[in-house]
Amino acid sequence: NKFKVTTWGESHGKALGAVIDGCPAGLPLCEEDIQKFLDRRKPGQSRYTTARKEGDLVEILSGVFEGKTTGTPISLMVRNTDQRSRDYGNIAYSYRPGHADYTFDQKYGFRDYRGGGRSSGRETIGRVAAGAIASKILEELGISICTYTRSIGPVEIASFNKEEIHQNAFYMPDAQAAVKAGEYLEECMKNQDSAGGVIECRITGTPAGLGEPVFDKLSALLAHALMSIGAVKAVEIGDGIAVTSSNGSTDNDGFTVKDGEIIKTSNHAGGIMGGISDGSEIILRAHIKPTPSISQPQQTVTKDKEPLSLEIHGRHDPVIVPRAVVVVESMAAITLADALFVNMSSQMDKVRDFIGNNSN
């Protein structure tokens, strides 16, 4: 990897953040560029998110001087300010269904039970901060990413209006679907339950040629990046699982020439063929599970193997899909930025051009 991201911190620790290695020098960057992304995922913005009040204000600690990146590691930090660790005292010695409590204990023999510690959704703060930088790189190169909520529970969008995405609490491009999603969530909340959904990501301006032909296929890299998000249970590219009931005659994307350029006549593949970008729009979908923290009684056991009926109290999202939209976008941006830098050495002509442009 050329563009590397390390996240650090826990949900109820002093702070969280990220270290980014491999960002080129000379990229215009300030804290506001990153804050815009963090504001899209921060809690407490609607009745459908956790009541935890965090400003999630980012601090750039290194790697930026006089408004531009220096080419050295960029260190970012966001301080936790509204932890309520007492809310988690009742689960210190029991395993919450749907969480990583049991598996962390099995792996490490020890865990931070306060808000899930490292497995908390707050870990994604570092991903989003790094994603903001990756997105700035892509923007400089004419690549744009549009990410939105495709569905919440059984409610799916029936129309697409890009301007509507930031006009509702769910980041849905369909105003009517957003209203129905709100009604569905009200019912979930009344029943002390939660919901999942689907996030769709569309990337335009990507050049053909990104990705490797075997193990590091662009499709595999993107799927790995999205599946590394805690709540993601499945990833689709292009027509996804629908191709299993299709035929080659309808699934294959044909080619034609327009204005002297080779283009595809359709995009069932979602912009990636043979693991390599083909220059058309890249289409991804991430399937998000329902929030596992619910107030309904759930059957579990303690560390001592005693049965227990557990009710999870605290401040939890009835749905995490809207706040995960920018997380999916950030992971896609990080993956593409890295693929771009790796691809710079894919041909000798590109290496010769670099040497030629930098010779005295």
Q: Where are each of the predicted segments found?
A:
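Generic N-terminal targeting/processing segments that precede catalytic cores or assembly contacts
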Residues: 1-360
